[in-house]
């Protein structure tokens, strides 16, 4: 049983590492980014508002996100086996999450912070694109699709509107201002562990796995 929070600025690789952690430790990935994008895809009233906010580099309101998160926490099949990716983003959300978990007789067991510099973030975000068919994510600086890959051909590759340098910088600055106090919140609870987000995907995952294995031992 493990509830884990994964921190790091946009582009730090939280989604990639979450996928690995979910697979190895049989956790449910609660990605607020995925939840919000689904609302946008559905073109609901809230989804259209979310689209404008994200494109401008700002964050969605706490109340909206908290309601979506509670829908997952309240589901018994996910009890004490959730990895929170992209939430909580600020101190208000962190306190709200604690209250929600207590309400459903759960707690946070570990908080991981992927430490990543702005220059790396700019390349990861501005160079990011994905396959419209399978959803696989690539990067023109670090990870180009194979020329032998029929699915992820040039015709099927797309780039999100908010994946550009200006938005990357604004999102990083917003993250530093609003999210870093949350790190202190978990540090005071002695739940925070820092991981080198500048390393390769495999090295970062190895470092994360070692930390989780010690907790679960």
Model-derived features with residue positions:
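Glycine-rich phosphate-binding loop of ATP-dependent small-molecule kinases
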Residues: 1-217
């Amino acid at each position: 049983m493990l509830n884990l929070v994964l921190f790091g600025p946009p582009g730090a690789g939280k989604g990639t590492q979450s996928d690995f952690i979910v697979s190895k430790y049989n956790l449910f990935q609660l990605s607020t980014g995925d939840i919000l994008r689904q609302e946008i895809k559905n073109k609901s009233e809230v989804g259209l508002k979310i689209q404008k906010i994200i494109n401008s580099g700002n964050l969605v309101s706490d109340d909206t996100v908290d309601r979506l998160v509670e829908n997952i926490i309240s589901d018994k099949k996910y009890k004490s086996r959730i990895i929170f990716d992209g939430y909580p983003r600020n101190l208000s959300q962190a306190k709200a999450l604690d209250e929600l978990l207590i309400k459903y007789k759960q707690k946070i067991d570990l908080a991981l912070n992927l430490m990543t510099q702005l220059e790396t973030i700019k390349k990861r975000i501005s160079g990011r694109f994905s396959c419209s068919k399978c959803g696989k994510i690539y990067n023109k600086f670090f990870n180009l699709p194979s020329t032998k890959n029929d699915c992820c051909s040039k015709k099927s590759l797309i780039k999100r509107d908010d994946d550009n340098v200006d938005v990357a910088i604004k999102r990083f600055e917003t993250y530093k201002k609003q999210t870093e106090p949350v790190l202190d919140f978990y540090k005071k609870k002695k739940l925070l562990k820092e991981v080198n987000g500048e390393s390769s995907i495999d090295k970062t995952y190895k470092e994360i796995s070692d930390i989780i294995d010690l907790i679960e031992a």
